[in-house]
Every structure is written in structure tokens, then in C-alpha cells.
Amino acid sequence: MKKVLYVDCCIRGEESRTKKIADAFFANLCDQYEVKHLDLKNENLKPLVNDFFDEREKLIAEHNLTHPRFRYAHELADVDMVVIAAPFYDLSFPSLLKIYIENCTVDGITFASTSTGLKGLCKATNMYYFTSRGGFYHNAADEQATPYLKHLCNFLGIDHFDYIDADGMDVVD
């Protein structure tokens, strides 16, 4: 059975409009995929700073890529599809998602540095991004999340990126 990684960064939990969109998507996938639901607000994610960063760099230099701290990278590299649900915050997405991404991008697991440049190593062929926004930002230059995630796909070797954005949810005319 194919595997999906559901990266849930819906800070408001069940009240999240973004989560409701993602849940509707998953209602149609339940029989086709084994879904790993990763609720980021319940994970003990750490930003890559100070000793935590130094330890990571040392492990990578030693080629110790089986260390437990690389769990998120291995999960991401080994699935057939990635679904990210995150609301629109400050022109992008919540910082928790960025911290997660920093912990996933590991040379030798999700990408490789080669003599011809970087090569994505992720098995997934599709990434889907679901978001909701209070205002209207679809294809706006100010909206930074969608282009960032699209570039991340290319970096990780994921061929297809698509998104659903629910805009104008707080606009009252």
C-alpha cells in the first residue's frame, strides 16, 4: 500500500479551516493509502541553533544518518505522497512548519550534494499544500508560502506540486 505523510501545522486543531480542507481531501484517500498523520504542534521540534545545529552537522559529517534525530527526514524521504496543511501567517505559514522543514532537509537522506549540483532523494512524486487565508492573496507577490513549498519540492526531487488555497475567509463586504 502506498504511503502518505500528512504534515499538519494547523495550530487551531479541529477548529482550523485549513484542517477541514485537508480532512476533506483525506476522506477520499482512506482506502488507497496508509496515512501517517504528523501533528506538528504535538512534536518536540527544535530549531537548528547552537548545540542542536552543531550535533546535526557532526552526525552528517560522520555519515551517521541512522541517528534518531533524523527521523523526520527518513519519514519524508520514504513516502509516496506528501500533504502539508498550514494556515497563512505573516505572508507565509507558521514558523513551526519551517522548523520541521529544517529538520527534514538532510544531505544524504532527502537530498544529495553531487559533483553536478544538488539532487533530490525523496521517493514521493506529489506534494499537496492546503491553506486558508483571511484576505485575498492567491498568486499575490506578498504570498511567500506557496512559491517556497514549490521550490522545496524541486529541491527534494518531488516532481509534482499542487495547492488549494481558500482565500478571503475573513473578508466582510
Model-derived features with residue positions:
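N-terminal beta1-alpha1-beta2 submodule of the flavodoxin-like/Rossmannoid cofactor-binding fold
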Residues: M1-A86, L91-E102, V106
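A short helix->loop->beta-strand "cap" motif at the edges of active sites that frequently abuts
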Residues: K2, K123-N126
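Short histidine/acidic/glycine/proline-rich micro-motifs that form metal-
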Residues: I11-G13, G134-Y137, D170
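Hydrophobic residues at beta-strand termini and immediately following loops
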Residues: L38, F130, I164
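Short, well-ordered beta-strand core segments
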Residues: V82, M127-Y128
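Short, acidic/small-residue loops that bind anionic groups at enzyme active sites
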Residues: C104-K119
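Short, conserved loop/helix-junction motifs that constitute active-site signature segments
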Residues: L118-A124, L156
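Glycine-rich phosphate/pyrophosphate-binding loop and the adjoining helix
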Residues: H138-D173
